[in-house]
Amino acid sequence: MAHVFGIDIGGTGIKGAPVDLENGKLLAERVKLDTPQPATPEAVAATVAELTTGFGWTGPAGITFPGVVVNGVVMTAANVDEHWIGTDARELFSKATGLSVEVINDADAAGLAEMKYGVGAGENGTVLMLTLGTGIGSALFIDGILVPNTEFGHIEIHGKDAEKRAAESAREGEGLTWGKWAGRVDHYLEHMERLLSPQLIIIGGGISRKSDKFLPLLTGLRARVVAATLQNDAGIVGAAMVAPSA
């Protein structure tokens, strides 16, 4: 099926659109709704249903989630209510929308999209995609195959989760200059390079639109470091890629 619906759940917004899997393009302008607060399973499911209903969608859908997802079940929850842990999200969203759905980690979805339709297309070997936003999401690929749920943003550096130091939210929250923040990102990437030896590191998330501000400041890395090209549509497109029968 070439046309499917993708939904990207974030800590502040839930966005969705139909996607053409032939080319990875959105078939309509995406719609973004506020993530309910508190972001309980029931409240988020209702918002997801509002999105699909608004488009009159009756086909399959893929949905991202900001946490570890194993066989449709949420194992960790970042930036959403802790009651998600242990929830069968696939069943919950299917009942709420009346659709056939699949659920995937948000960074993994963005990585899948970037590896098929974006800057990672055709890349073999070890590729690491990192989304720098509220936190740090990660997607690891070995010869094009996803290693799911890596959660490398939670690796400890200087006694803190890496995302507390190197996410975009740290730059904004601490008022860091681009140079100061780039130094933190550089240190984090050096750490990841020692662990994984990737040939390519892709930087995604909204910050990828400002890559000229910090990518030239990264030094000492063997890997190529490039900005993602799908930017904020990557999650929607990647979600659509894992939709049932997609």
Say what each PLM segment does:
Residues M1-A61, V69-V73, E91-L99, A113-M129, ...:
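ATP-binding/phosphotransfer module of carbohydrate and carboxylate kinases, centering on a glycine-rich
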Residues P66:
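Conserved NAD(P)H cofactor-binding loop of Rossmann-fold oxidoreductase domains
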Residues V74-G86:
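A charged helix-plus-loop insertion that forms the helical arch/lid used to bind
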Residues V101-D106:
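General beta-strand structural signal in soluble alpha/beta enzymes
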Residues I136:
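Extracytoplasmic strand-loop-helix segments at the start of, or within, the mature domains
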